[in-house]
Amino acid sequence: MLRHNFRSSIFIRIVANSWSITRSVSSAPIKAESRKQQDSLKNIDSGEAYTALGNIRQKKDVFHYTDRASGTGYSHYSNSVYQHRPYIWPPLRKMYNWNYAFVIAGMVILMSDFEWIKEQIKGASTPFRPEASQKEESTDSGTEIEVKEKPKKKKLGFRERRIIEYEDRLRLYSTPDKIFRYFATLKIIDPNDESGRIFEVFMTPEDFLRSFTPGVMQPRRWGLDSFKAYNPEKHKRHKFSDPNSIFYKLGENGLINFSDYLFLMTLLSTSHADFALAFKIFDVDGNGALDKEEFTKVQQLIMSQTTVGQRHRDHVTPNSSFRVETNSALETYFFGKDGKGSLSSEKFIEFQERLQHDILKMEFERRDAMENSDGLITEESFAQLLLLHAQIAEKKQKHMLKRVKRRFKGDQSKGVSFDETKAFFEFLYHIDDVDIALHFHKMAGMSIDAKLLKRVAVKVTGIPLSDHVVDVVITLFDDNLDGKLSHEEMVAVMRRRMRRGLERPRDTGLFRLFDAVLECGKRAYHASPLPFY
């Protein structure tokens, strides 16, 4: 009994001691944490000691950045939050820095001029080509072989295409003074002006042709109000046109000022019959000739009827170089330096025909010449010359030219001379009479083939056409390849070609729409019997 009591007392003492030890050990951290919180709250305002949910606000370290625990990567850490985040293969993550290399390489490729690099490589590899060894062998043997290589056309880049599109819109919709300021390249400074700010702007014949020819880009050095200073006394030998050309007779070395530019554009867009009628109207004396004053009235009348003259804004032109002058080179050529001469209608129409001839010659010389032949252009180039101002969709135009190229290739290609081109364009000057004749033949049930077209040309205009040129024209406008000519489209295209696109309205059509709506409203107002309130 005593032994049992002794054992129980020892057990009770052991349990009590362990409880006291456990209690002291477990309560020590709690007391330390509570003392720490009390010390931290001494310097905190009572309003900021607790959060919105009633919890004690913990003091943050000044350099605390994130609560994220350190791990193997962002994808591993976020998988517990975003369950559907794609898995990235660890070796692929190590290649992340290669992205910078790919971006830099792409930028270098986009900024590289591959045409220049290609030319450099081609120039460096020329001595190592087989052609070079053949040339060396031919020179060693003493034989002189002249090989004319056809220069390849340089493909237009993105920048050039955008510039050409802008310049084509400029030709269509801008005022004549802006077109002149953009395409003119020369200026002659007034010798009496020491500052050099007073000058007159001139066009060369090439500038004049470029100002209304679509698809031809202005040289990069020149643009709007950008001109090269030209001194006629220092450059007396420099001629910008052939002495036999009509441009050479207009002024200094064949240069064109703004007044002459306006009237030359009017000449290109007006037929011979209109000028002959205007001469008869203003010939008060009835002697068949006009003096300077009467010619000025004819000039103003014709210009007011053309789109070029209607768009001219003489009253708002800032520079005197772009105003119509009463004493221009044209008037000096027609009436002499004193202005007392007279101009007959025959002389004026002859001047107009020579102008058409010189411009056609410059357009012909711009075409692609045939290989190993002088003075001939390819049939495709002749077709391009006919479609120059056709206003046909680009896709259809390419299809028409492709048809001509397939028809005249290899031995079938004979080339077209300037005399043949000139004869066909003289035939086109009577396009209205040709249209009537072809229409009558069609009403009679006759198909328009090459034989009929040549006969109409001789009977109506008195101009014989070569068989080869007629074959090219029929191939160009023969859509169904039956050897017959669809003359309606040909006549419409040739009319626009002879006017060189100068008869088109010089606006986008929006203002004409507003004018039409206003005119219809006025007519409805005056014609309505009901009062408008």
From Swiss-Prot:
Gene Ontology BP annotations: calcium import into the mitochondrion; mitochondrial calcium ion homeostasis; positive regulation of mitochondrial calcium ion concentration
Transit peptide: first to last position: 1-13
Keywords attached to this entry: Calcium, Calcium transport, Ion transport, Membrane, Metal-binding, Mitochondrion, Mitochondrion inner membrane, Repeat, Transit peptide, Transport
Gene3D superfamilies linked: EF-hand
Residue positions binding Ca(2+): D283, D285, N287, E294
Molecular function GO terms recorded: calcium ion binding
Region (Disordered): 127-147
GO-annotated cellular components: mitochondrial intermembrane space; uniplex complex
InterPro entries for the chain: EF-hand-dom_pair, EF_Hand_1_Ca_BS, EF_hand_dom, MICU1/2/3
Domain EF-hand: 270-305, 337-358, 465-500
Compartments (UniProt record): Mitochondrion intermembrane space; Mitochondrion inner membrane
Function according to Swiss-Prot or TrEMBL: Calcium sensor of the mitochondrial calcium uniporter (mcu-1) channel, which senses calcium level via its EF-hand domains. At low calcium levels, micu-1 occludes the pore of the mcu-1 channel, preventing mitochondrial calcium uptake. At higher calcium levels, calcium-binding to micu-1 induces a conformational change that weakens mcu-1-micu-1 interactions and moves micu-1 away from the pore, allowing calcium permeation through the mcu-1 channel. Also required to protect against manganese toxicity by preventing manganese uptake by mcu-1.
Protein family per UniProt: Belongs to the MICU1 family. MICU1 subfamily.
Free-text comment about domains: The EF-hand domains have high affinity for calcium and act as sensors of calcium levels.
Protein name from the UniProt record: Calcium uptake protein 1 homolog, mitochondrial
Origin species: Caenorhabditis briggsae
